[in-house]
């Protein structure tokens, strides 16, 4: 079966080896905001597009991947 692993913002960050603090430094998004996005995806869904775009660029993923769709493009090595 070819199931894709669905990743959260926290998982993308961990996959890249970034702490919340490091991602904050890279994006200009406060660490508290990143914590809130990781804690409750509703907060992320209510974020400004420009904020989500900064996170996506830093994580080297498409903006759509930040919103966790099963059909989102994932790196091949995490597809199962």
Question: Language-model features: where?
Answer:
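Short coil turns linking two alpha-helices in DNA-binding domains
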Residues: 19, 30-33, 48, 62
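Short, charged recognition helix plus adjacent turn
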Residues: 57, 65-80
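The alpha-helix within a helix-turn-helix
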Residues: 13, 24, 56
